[in-house]
From Swiss-Prot:
Transmembrane domains' residue ranges: 122-142, 203-220, 229-249
Domain ABC transmembrane type-1, residue spans: 47-253
Protein name listed in UniProt: Putative phosphite transport system permease protein HtxE
Family membership: Belongs to the binding-protein-dependent transport system permease family.
Subcellular location(s) of the protein: Cell inner membrane
The organism of origin for this protein: Stutzerimonas stutzeri
CC annotations in GO: plasma membrane
Main location: membrane
Amino acid sequence: MWPPAIAETEEVGRIQDLDRQKLPLFSHIETQERVEQKMNLDTLKMEATTETVEVLVKPVGYVWTVFIKMIETWRLRCGARSCRCWCRFPWRISRPATTSPNRFTYTAARGTISLLRSAPELIVALFLVLAYGFGPIAGVLALGLHAAGFLGKFYAEDIENADKKPQEALEAIGAGKLKTLWYGVIPQVLPQYIAYTAYILDRNLRMATVIGLVGAGGIGQELKGRFDMFQYGHVMTILIAIFVFVFVLDQLQARIRAKLI
């Protein structure tokens, strides 16, 4: 697996409308010899043959490809966050017994959140790939729905466990349920909300890599393809990129959280 793959090569004969005078930035054309095993039809034995081919070499081409795939994985994560936000808000209010409008809404919200948490993202992604095909749509829905279930549970439990005295004081002066929630509950649970959200965002980035293995887009799909073709240098490049991306994201989240809390 070492050294990691950095450059990217492509046979000139397979590139349509290639202008040798206007090559991509930092690219060049060189001649390479490739040894291939072919069967001799006369002896019916495998023999090594050497072929000379012209290839277009992009010195950092594969690094750029991995970067684009990581951006796609980031978009999966952001799309899942948007889906999660739309799903979790009504459940966050209706799931706690203290803020639920009635018993039926409370039971329905609890059941829905439990249903979303019960199925792992990988299994959900497999079914969504069958429904929507290969691509990021299946990944966004799988990550978003599963994360909505977890955050719905965490948020609701924090609301239920919040100190009742500020809420009782607001209700005593005639505040409604929404104002009581906004002024009496949210300030108490906001630090926990930030911590839970940061954790789920970090987890979604790692899970976006995993669900890409089943065709749901992102860097995981590229990782599986290179692994299946035994291109372990490319696999090492992808693993390094994932580590760097997660490390940088973790540092940014730590700084943001320190400023907000």
